[in-house]
């Protein structure tokens, strides 16, 4: 004799299926709400890590100066790079060289500080395709590079940092796609806050932190600076001309100051 399920049991099973669908829908809604929050949390964590990296590098740089009669490690010597090497020019197999750099003894061998954790760059060169770069930080070219922009201060010692002052002179930053050697070249010959029409510079800063970049300063502090001109984050070529770009003006204002001595 065939047995039939009771109406009550069928109703219970149908209700359980509906409950399951409701739970799935709720989970989907919660996930949709959490994913942006998790993304923002990741951005914040990367910012903090990058600021910590630039701060560690700058403190090492300051201790180096203290050990050498205030003489700072300059923009040429702080990072020995053979830019002709097809791998080194994108710093993709450079870890073995990072441990040899002059600041490394002050960093306890922690080569991770040379890279921004948000730097997504990977090599496209034959033999290295897909290999992540291992360095994204460069130094302000006005630390020791004598022939860059005539008429502007070059800093050799910490005591030279009179203008714009240690708190307003950057040492390290995240460099963008223009990265090659250890220097970040800012052209001061177009620096005039009253004339923004001819803004031009050599190297480009990175936008790795949600359209912002990490900077450290000669007083030892680090900060994340938000770019205000959308062209800054979209720049793929260099040297870089960008009329009326307030971001170039800001970087220039933190790079050097007009020398009070007459140029020869």
PLM ranges: what are they?
Residues 6, 14, 73-77:
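Short hydrophobic/aromatic-rich motifs at helix boundaries and adjacent loops
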Residues 48-264:
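Short, well-structured segments within or immediately adjacent to enzyme catalytic domains
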Residues 7, 11-52:
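Amphipathic alpha-helical segments typified by the pilin-like N-terminal helix
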Residues 1-2:
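N-terminal hydrophobic targeting signals that begin at the initiator methionine
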């Amino acid at each position: 004799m065939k047995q039939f399920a009771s109406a009550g049991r069928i109703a219970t099973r149908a209700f359980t299926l509906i409950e399951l669908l409701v739970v799935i829908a709720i989970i989907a809604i919660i996930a949709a709400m959490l994913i942006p929050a998790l993304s923002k949390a990741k951005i914040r964590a990367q910012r903090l890590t990058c600021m910590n990296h630039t701060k560690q590098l700058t403190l090492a740089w300051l201790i180096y100066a203290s050990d050498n009669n205030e003489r700072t490690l300059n923009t040429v010597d702080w990072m020995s790079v053979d830019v002709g090497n097809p791998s080194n020019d994108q710093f993709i197999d450079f870890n073995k060289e990072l441990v040899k750099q002059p600041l490394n003894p002050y960093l306890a061998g922690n080569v991770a500080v040379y890279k921004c954790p948000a730097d997504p760059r990977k090599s496209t060169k034959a033999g290295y395709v897909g290999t992540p770069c291992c360095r994204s930080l460069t130094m302000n070219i006005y630390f020791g590079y004598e022939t860059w922009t005539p008429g502007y201060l070059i800093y050799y010692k910490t005591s030279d940092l009179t203008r714009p002052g240690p708190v307003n002179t950057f040492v390290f930053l995240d460099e963008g796609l223009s990265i090659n050697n250890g220097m970040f070249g800012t052209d001061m010959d177009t620096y005039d806050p009253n004339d923004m029409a001819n803004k031009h510079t050599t190297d480009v800063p990175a936008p790795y932190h949600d359209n912002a970049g990490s900077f450290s300063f000669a007083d030892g502090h680090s900060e994340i600076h938000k770019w205000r001109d959308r062209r800054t984050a979209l720049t793929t070529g260099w040297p870089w001309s960008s009329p009326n770009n307030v971001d170039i003006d800001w970087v220039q204002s933190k790079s050097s100051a007009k020398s009070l001595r007459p140029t020869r």
